[in-house]
Amino acid sequence: MSVILPESHPEHPFNLIPELCRRFYDLGWATGTGGGISIKMGDNYYVAPSGVQKERIKSNEIFVLNSSQDIVEKPRTDKQLKMSECTPLFFNAYRMRNAGACLHTHSVKCVLISLLCDREFRISHIEMLKGISNNETKKALGFRDTLIVPIIENTDFEKDLTASMAECMEKYPESCAVLVRRHGMYVWSDTWQKAKGAVECIDYLMGLAIQMKQLGLEWEPKDVK
């Protein structure tokens, strides 16, 4: 987010992060305090707190960090809040992809796909692919393109995923997402709008893929004209 918005603006991260957390909760992506959201504006990185009811986060409960991952402003509340455990992984996206936002979901569809696939989730010839961009070219995928989302193994603590996620991002420079087996997914993009659109499209495709699997349909059909 290149434009610096006043704190009263509905799209300022102080207001936007709680709104998106509520949306994610309603979708089943951030239940049980799970999931996370971070948005960059100017030189600051805004991060939701950890271990809280995501649908009840307030604008004064957001952490503000600098590019060195140092806290420059703590939440403006008396609550003893803890910064998101996802923070080092968000910064993978900021440092390696120059992202404007990074989203973390605990979607059931993502977890199921991580159990159905070995090292990658691949799907092609579905219209909703067009809502996802190639991370290198920044161009939207086409109907005949193949979406590839790599999968890394889960760890006991979120921070311990940092190195394996970074290694995976280096190996898959075109991908805007990484699946964590039995856990969830991280998605990033240049703006929060694009990141939101991408995670919605990928989640849709994963839900569709699960149903296709049940019907014996191929995720990468070879005979589609």
Curated annotation (Swiss-Prot):
Binding site for Zn(2+): 104, 106, 183
Pfam family, one: Aldolase_II
One of the GO BP terms on file: L-methionine salvage from methylthioadenosine
Pathway: Amino-acid biosynthesis; L-methionine biosynthesis via salvage pathway; L-methionine from S-methyl-5-thio-alpha-D-ribose 1-phosphate: step 2/6
Known EC number: 4.2.1.109
Compartment list: Cytoplasm
Positions contributing to substrate binding: 86
InterPro entries in alphabetical order: Aldolase_II/adducin_N, Aldolase_II/adducin_N_sf, MethylthioRu-1-P_deHdtase_MtnB, Salvage_MtnB_euk
GO cellular-component term (any): cytoplasm
MF annotations from Gene Ontology: methylthioribulose 1-phosphate dehydratase activity; zinc ion binding
Active site per database record: 127
Class in the EC hierarchy, top level: lyase
Record function comment: Catalyzes the dehydration of methylthioribulose-1-phosphate (MTRu-1-P) into 2,3-diketo-5-methylthiopentyl-1-phosphate (DK-MTP-1-P).
Family the UniProt entry places it in: Belongs to the aldolase class II family. MtnB subfamily.
Protein name: Probable methylthioribulose-1-phosphate dehydratase
Species annotation: Leishmania braziliensis
